[in-house]
Amino acid sequence: MFENLTDRLERSFKILKGEGKITELNVAATLKDVRRALLDADVNYKVAKEFTDTVKDKAIGMNVLTAIKPGQLMVKIVHDELAKLMGGEASELHLSGKPAIVLMSGLQGSGKTTFSGKLANMLKKKQHKNPLLVACDVYRPAAIDQLKVVGESIGVPVYSEPDNKNVNEIADHAIQEAKANGHDVVIIDTAGRLAVDEQMMNEISSLKEHVCPDETLFVVDSMTGQDAVNTAKEFNDRLDFDGVVLTKLDGDTRGGAALSIRTVVTKPIKFIGTGEKMEAIDVFHPERMADRILGMGDVVSLVERAQEQFDEEEAKRLQKKIQKNKFDFNDFLKQIEQIKKMGNIKDLASMIPGVGKAIKDIDIDNNAFNGIEAIIRSMTPKERTNPEVLNQSRKLRIAKGSGTSIQEVNRLVKQFDQTRKMMKMVTGSGMKQMMRNMPKMK
């Protein structure tokens, strides 16, 4: 995410390396490079100019403390201004209606249907809501089926009327259905449309006026850069939406939309999509995004994702197994599955300070786990729970069954043994023993 921009900004800050203090001359040289980096990232020209002018005003003439190098101060100023540029603080959904209504809008192919499912899933799991998805795309033949597939995957019901082309009526009936069945949030998925399509824009404007949604969200593909910003402005002029959802942000190496949209549209970015899975949705935090853009990582978001996947009871159960040296391949497989649910591995690694830069040229994705999973799934229940029984003939059978080599099976078994020993060392009495064996501080 935003790798190109991160690299360019790092190079820009190197201009100040070795400088004793901030001067108008070295600030101008640095910010000229910063502005060029922003423009190359497809940031709106006016936004880039205003941003660098603000940073320049704050930096010039500032008395730098002897402990703070000019480069470090510039990073701090740029960080704070980036966070402000993207909204300053997270903007929450306001769901006060009974039921609360969320209306989706955007171009075709922007990811509205998938995001509708992600939002329903998040509200269900994190806020214990009982959402209802509503299919109001009456034009695309497969739209209703797509939403139903999404709904089934997360256990959320979908309301649809395949033979009705009146979206206002469908929404009315869906709200009645929600009230009758205790659904406290209604998420209305609509057809994709262009802002210049008068008939389609009139339809969604009428729908908004008819249902009076608590939130109207504009969903846009972040990888379209400035086009995303321009489209958002056109939609906002007609629809006056409440917030923006940036999808496919995990594949966006530039970041122009995220950095420009708040200033141009004057509406907050509320959510970001970071992958294809239903769990790949984050509340947008400008401060954290500024951290990531400047290569500082985002440990808070990483911990939050981990907490969503690992519950306390499971952690206690696992700890007991580790202490008794009973950690087995079933547990190992479960850990892999939970890590995969957290999102793209490279994206997760980039949240750890310093790691993103180290792995930027390495091709890492969740497919790296496929071989490990295939090997474990090719084991018998006895072999999974008792790894000690894995002799050469068993390993050969597992290699054939998993489509891997005997060397790969041996490597996994060796890594598993090392992991098990290390886990026992840090969770049980082994850690106390290690501490006792360490030389005393003099």
Report the location of each language-model feature:
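Long amphipathic alpha-helical segments used for membrane anchoring, targeting, substrate engagement
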Residues: 2-19, 288-442
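Primarily NTPase-proximal linker/entry elements flanking Walker-type ATP/GTP-binding cores
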Residues: 8-136, 143-164, 170-190
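Residue-level signature of catalytic and energy-coupling elements of molecular machines
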Residues: 16, 42, 78, 107, ...
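Short, small-residue-enriched loops and turns at beta-alpha junctions
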Residues: 110, 139-141, 165-167, 192-196, ...
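Short, surface-exposed connector motifs at secondary-structure boundaries
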Residues: 126-132, 154-158, 184-186, 211-216, ...
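Short, glycine/polar-rich helix-capping loops at beta-to-alpha or helix-loop-helix junctions
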Residues: 141-147, 228-231
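Conserved phosphate-handling catalytic cores of large alpha/beta enzymes
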Residues: 171-175, 179, 183, 195, ...
